[in-house]
Amino acid sequence: MKMDHILVRYGELALKGKNRGHFEKLLLANIRHVLKPFPKVQAKRTFGRIVVELNSTDHEPVAAALANVFGIQSYSLALRVENELEAMQKGALFMLTQHPDAKTFKVSARRAYKLFPIDSQSLNHKIGSYVLKAFTGELAVDVHHPDVNVVVDVRESGTYITAGVYAGAKGLPVGSSGKVLHLLSGGIDSPVAAHMLMGRGAEVEMLHFHSPPYTNERAKQKVIDLTRELTKFGRTITLHFVPFTDIQTHIHKEVPSSYEMTIMRRMMLRIADRIARERGILAISNGESLGQVASQTLASMNTINEMTNLPVLRPLLAMDKETTIAYAKRIGTYETSILPYEDCCTIFLPTDSKTKPKRDRSAHFEQYVQVEEKCREAIAGIESLEVTGAHTSPTLDQLF
């Protein structure tokens, strides 16, 4: 015998009423995305859950991939047998042998297929008695707090037997809450913020500003690698590279150093706003944390936010750096984030940045930056990639 299925249970999406079908389809699509490395594995919707058929594939890497998918409340490794009592008994016995340290157990039969002739209570008794006899005193029944709960789920297509429940990523399926344009810097914070948004159902498109030759190809590859890490949580991610060298050198030349960071951030947000509107995206996000640096004070955020009417989401706003670092390590982005390749935010970094920049002063300095021309040129030079878990390729259609 071999565990040949994984039963996936829904999380919050089960509470979505009339939209449940839509959420289920999104979750199924996201599950199929993370299972692409396993060509024999199939996933399908059936009887109020998603069933993953392993088809002789090792269950451990498949279960590990499923554990990352938002929208999954829990999952169980399952053995499928025919709707025959003897097969159920032997199946339950096999599942218990996978828990050698267990001292107590119970059988919980669910006869969803009402044409099966043995009712649930009788199944509990018949299967439990068979297991007790096989273990000859090594196991005891505990119906209240068993070490192992053997669930026997009788369906028309067959009986699924499980003996353990594993926690999923919970949250909402990626894509169920709409799209967000996320500013991905290449540091520790922004990938964590993107992951948090994905957990609330947001489909993120990434926007990265790069400044060659001050930032090199390794810095660009680092951002691609971070984006690829995030695809394991649900789906392919579109990544946009905005050429920012000309804007950045122009700001450095024309703007007082105390306002350089503010004007640079305002230009980034201007460009992000235009890209988001072009693509029908309803919010912009980033990895800012309140008070972490000069550009992340409330006064700075207020002055920078002037460049858009779209919501600017900041999932890390109240998180400290240690918490963010621990989060990055948990989701697997930390080691890539700390690679020593500069991004555009570290170039020409002034030491006297204003922590309370004024809107009127910012607008005054922007008169010398040729804002409209520079924004148009940057957007015209965007390079867009579709990043998957396996490879990266240019988008087929011209996006801008």
From Swiss-Prot:
CDD domains: PPase_ThiI (cd01712), THUMP_ThiI (cd11716)
EC number: 2.8.1.4
Domain THUMP: 60-165
InterPro entries the record matches: Rossmann-like_a/b/a_fold (IPR014729), ThiI_AANH (IPR020536), ThiI_fer (IPR054173), ThiI_N (IPR049961), THUMP_dom (IPR004114), THUMP_ThiI (IPR049962), tRNA_STrfase (IPR003720), tRNA_sulfurtransferase_ThiI (IPR050102)
Annotated localization: Cytoplasm
Main subcellular location of this protein, as a coarse class: cytoplasm
Pathway: Cofactor biosynthesis; thiamine diphosphate biosynthesis
Transmembrane regions: none
GO cellular component: cytosol
GO molecular function: ATP binding; CCA tRNA nucleotidyltransferase activity; tRNA binding; tRNA-uracil-4 sulfurtransferase activity
Binding locations of ATP: L183, L184, H208, F209, R265, G287, Q296
NCBIfam families: tRNA uracil 4-sulfurtransferase ThiI
HAMAP family: ThiI (MF_00021)
Function comment: Catalyzes the ATP-dependent transfer of a sulfur to tRNA to produce 4-thiouridine in position 8 of tRNAs, which functions as a near-UV photosensor. Also catalyzes the transfer of sulfur to the sulfur carrier protein ThiS, forming ThiS-thiocarboxylate. This is a step in the synthesis of thiazole, in the thiamine biosynthesis pathway. The sulfur is donated as persulfide by IscS.
Protein name listed in UniProt: Probable tRNA sulfurtransferase
Lineage start: Bacteria, Bacillati, Bacillota, Bacilli, Bacillales
Gene for this chain: thiI
